[in-house]
């Protein structure tokens, strides 16, 4: 029902006992309540998001129905964090890809899916494996692993390395295929490499968020905020003390450089509005669990 102050009163008795109520404010007079209901294998129910507006349910989003996809369960719903800008709300939790809930052109038009990054953040996972490129420019170059036990996974990103980005020797590559030995990846150069020397395991970087297990390096962020015109993620599974910031004014682009073409050279330059990654240095492990954006970004561990 709609209360005297214009707020929405939602009766939750018919929902799963672990359901979450989350406000979604698109603008004045356009306030919604999202009832997020987790999947529960013990009673064979799917995850659902119920959308309420002025006291009435105007939409129901069900995982696996009408293109909606969200892996919200009884085991992770309590740890979900959200941030919203205009008609998009983003949900994060360390075991699932970031989700985007989008309000369309009307009160009843809603969709939920994995967040579509223009460019994922990148990070070094301190692999004990050297990576050597076969060329500085071009398509179809080889990226060969040695001196360690890291291997390429022959599957499409985020389940495998095909489609993932690799940063090494001041350049950027995108993997297009994996050889059968899982030691050599074939890649296209996006930004020219400075040279073809071997890059040690603590130097080359890989796409930060993925379904890879901890032996490979990946996971998803625990915390989220919009701050000073950037989208901020924090505390991923395998980088629990790290902050990932998007480019300024380009929320879904975490690229740390701007692509510059000069003649036959294509390079990446670091600019003030570029994305960045920052890891908190401390004498003990402090997992980033929450952000509050005010004049400064407050980080809670």
What role is predicted for each listed range?
Residues 26, 31-60:
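Nucleic acid-processing catalytic cores of prokaryotic defense/repair systems
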Residues 40-52, 97-102, 239-248:
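Structural motif
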Residues 2-24, 59-73, 119, 203-301:
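Beta-propeller and closely related beta-pinwheel folds
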Residues 53-130, 172, 189-190:
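Beta-strand-rich solenoidal segments
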Residues 15, 30, 45, 85, ...:
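Repetitive beta-strand solenoid architecture
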Residues 94-96, 181, 191-193, 237-239:
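Acidic glycine-/aspartate-rich tracts in secreted/extracellular proteins
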Residues 10, 59, 103, 110-203:
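Autoprocessing Asn-cyclization modules and mimics
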Residues 30-42, 87-93, 231-235, 289-301:
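Short beta-strand elements that form the blades of beta-propeller/WD-repeat-like
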């Amino acid at each position: 029902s709609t209360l005297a102050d214009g707020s929405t009163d939602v009766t939750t008795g018919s929902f799963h006992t672990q359901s979450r109520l989350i406000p979604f404010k698109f603008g004045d007079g356009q306030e919604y309540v999202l009832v997020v209901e987790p999947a529960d294998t013990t009673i064979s129910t799917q995850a659902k998001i119920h959308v309420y507006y002025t006291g009435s349910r105007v939409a129901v989003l069900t995982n696996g129905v009408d293109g909606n996809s969200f892996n919200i369960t009884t085991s992770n719903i309590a740890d979900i964090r959200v941030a919203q800008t205009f008609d998009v709300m983003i949900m994060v939790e360390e075991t699932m890809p970031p989700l985007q809930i989008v309000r369309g052109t009307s009160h009843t038009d809603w969709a939920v899916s994995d967040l579509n990054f223009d460019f994922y953040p990148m990070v070094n996972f301190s692999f004990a494996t050297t990576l050597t490129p076969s060329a500085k420019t071009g398509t179809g170059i080889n990226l060969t692993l040695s001196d360690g036990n890291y291997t390429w996974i022959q599957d499409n990103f985020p389940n495998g390395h095909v489609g993932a980005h690799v940063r090494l020797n001041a350049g950027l590559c995108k993997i297009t295929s994996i050889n059968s030995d899982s030691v050599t990846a074939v890649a296209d150069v996006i930004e020219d490499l400075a040279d073809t020397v071997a890059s040690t395991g603590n130097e080359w970087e890989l796409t930060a968020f993925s379904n890879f297990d901890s032996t490979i390096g990946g996971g998803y962020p625990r915390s989220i905020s919009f701050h000073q015109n950037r989208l901020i993620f924090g505390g991923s599974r395998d980088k629990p003390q790290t902050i990932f910031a998007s480019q300024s004014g380009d929320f879904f682009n975490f690229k740390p450089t701007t692509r510059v073409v000069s003649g036959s050279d294509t390079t990446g330059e670091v600019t003030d509005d570029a994305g960045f990654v920052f890891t908190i240095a401390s004498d003990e492990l402090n997992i980033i669990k929450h952000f509050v954006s005010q004049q400064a970004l407050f980080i809670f561990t």
